[in-house]
Amino acid sequence: MTAARTRVVYLAHAFMVGGAEEMVLNLVRHLPPKFEPMVCCINQAGPIGEEIRHTGTPVAVLGLNPGLRRPWDVGGIRRYLRDTRPQIVHTFLLTASIYGRLAAILERVPIVIGTEVNIYERKRRRHVLAERLLMKRTDCVVASARSVRDFYLRQVHADPSKVEVIYNAVDFAQAQPAKSKIDVRRELGVPADALVAGVIARLTEQKGHRFLFDALAASPQLSRLHLLVVGGGELHDTLVRQADARRLSGRVHFLGPRRDLGDLLAAMDMFVMPSLWEGLPLSMVLAMGAGLPVIATAVAGIPEVVEDGRTGLLVPPGDVAALASALTRLATDAPARERMGSAARAAVIPRFNVERYVESIVRLYDRLLNKHAERLRPARA
């Protein structure tokens, strides 16, 4: 008789383009056969949700929006869990972290796991209080970096034994270009001989694009530098106006959300991550895996990845002068770019590959399943 597979439900509000969503995509692609992954989109599937569906993994879209104004929507999540009867619920991002875990606890799902990917000091007090209550019945929260774990323990007053660091991972195959640098630049309208920096991030306050634009405008030595801005978000129009106001519109290229990241990285000479707060930005890790030197802010998990002066340059968050100085340093020193880029690739490939991440998650699942074997119940077909 074939052993029953362990059903794992991955819950998120929506699977848009982002690091946490990429983690779920990596898991459903690489989990060993003893696990049966299912994905539940509380609100909408999003582009990553559609990619997950193409792997053959069941993807449910509930169309719900739980919160203080719609607390009854938790009931919809409960019904889904009641129908699917998973042994493990693993939540990602804030809405699922609170309402998904609440539904899983109320439905007595045997193993409940959360994920914390950001240091977010401005989290609302009610969310912090909810996290503290939910931790009493949460079996583990996976933190994306040591600094994220340390902050979460202070913020939520969690039991340290229940918060485990598992560094996020990157599918470095995404960094392989299908086109040449010259061809990509031609398609983007970037001169073949230009110096090109890039940022891949959602267009939100967190990611600090405005400070990068200010830095570009501040230094005459950066007049040849073009910037590829990859990603979408609510600040798109504001940032376009800011670039225009600083007379950068001919050098700042807004590309929107893209999946051809290998081609775009091949067109860059350096990568910039000017975030004000973070967890562990996977686009930065991917860029390092592509052999690019990085300029990044020294927040959260970034200094755990970028070694200042060896694999990139670290600057304080929101410091335009420091950011302009770092950009100028790399823009005017091609050997340093080459040296740091090679060191960056060598540093991240062994530490942040998908195989290592999936192995760590599987060990966590196995440990919790063995520890709480008395809770287990058969999955519903």
Residue ranges of predicted features:
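A conserved mid-protein helix/loop that constitutes part of the nucleotide-sugar donor-binding site
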Residues: 18-29, 195, 199-220, 234-241, ...
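Short hydrophobic beta-strand element within catalytic cores of glycosyltransferases
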Residues: 293-296, 306
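Aromatic "clamp/platform" in nucleotide-sugar-dependent glycosyltransferases that forms part
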Residues: 257, 276
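Acidic anion/phosphate-binding donor-loop and adjacent secondary structure
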Residues: 66-72, 150-187, 352, 372
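A conserved, positively charged/aromatic
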Residues: 113-144, 150, 157
